[in-house]
């Protein structure tokens, strides 16, 4: 990605979303299966038990192959629930092959749930996080809603580890950072596990 383009958050978001939505079905299939192999070469994922993930939206890399692999390896999978656009809060509920899904206010699939199903943050081992772009410092650029920024705030003080998941082309040299932006310690792409030093 050009240096000029990488200087503007809005341009980065727009450009990557266009590229992401232009990925062919064959490429999507290949890349989503490659990232499963990459994920299970990451000891943090391999050894985790309670794993929060997400369902793909807006051209994001397909997470279903990874979720299936997690189930087959006896991992407990959880999906995010968006409480409201006002509070910008996320919480996570179990996702199994028997879960019934519906479209929320953002047209994103999420499970029907009871309040008693919500898992405590302290019981999550890791959270696989969607993103639009990431840079050489691990700075994450999301869709702009702020839900994950809010949930991941001060994640270093919590038990879970956040791990980004993206196509390789979603890496950019530099993202102009805002105070609310989160730096991820790890980002998975089909061809690489990116580790970032946390200051």
UniProtKB/Swiss-Prot annotation:
GO biological process: folic acid-containing compound biosynthetic process; tetrahydrofolate interconversion
UniProt-recorded name of the protein: Uncharacterized protein BUsg_396
Family, similarity comment: Belongs to the 5-formyltetrahydrofolate cyclo-ligase family.
Annotated organism of origin: Buchnera aphidicola subsp. Schizaphis graminum (strain Sg)
GO MF, one example: ATP binding
Residues reported in the UniProt entry to bind ATP: 9-13, 142-149, 181
Organism taxonomic ancestry: Bacteria, Pseudomonadati, Pseudomonadota, Gammaproteobacteria, Enterobacterales
Keywords, sorted A to Z: ATP-binding, Nucleotide-binding
Coiled coil regions in record: none
């Amino acid at each position: 990605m050009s240096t000029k383009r990488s200087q503007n958050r809005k341009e980065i978001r727009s450009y990557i979303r266009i590229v992401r939505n232009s990925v062919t079905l064959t490429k999507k299939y290949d890349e989503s299966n490659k990232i499963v192999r990459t994920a299970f070469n990451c000891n943090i994922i391999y050894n985790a038990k309670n794993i929060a993930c997400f369902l793909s939206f807006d051209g994001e890399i397909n997470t279903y192959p990874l979720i299936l692999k997690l189930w087959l390896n006896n991992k407990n999978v959880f999906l995010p629930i968006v409480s409201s656009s006002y509070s910008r809060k996320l919480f996570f509920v179990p996702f199994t092959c028997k879960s019934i899904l519906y479209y929320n206010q953002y047209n994103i699939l999420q499970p029907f749930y009871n309040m008693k199903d919500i898992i405590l943050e302290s019981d999550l081992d890791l959270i696989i996080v969607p993103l639009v772009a990431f840079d050489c410092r691990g700075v994450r650029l999301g869709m702009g809603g702020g839900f994950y920024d809010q949930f991941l705030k001060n994640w270093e003080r919590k038990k879970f580890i956040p791990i980004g998941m993206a196509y390789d082309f979603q890496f950019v040299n530099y993202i102009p950072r805002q105070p609310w932006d989160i730096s991820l310690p790890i980002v998975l792409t089909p061809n690489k596990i990116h580790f970032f030093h946390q200051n």
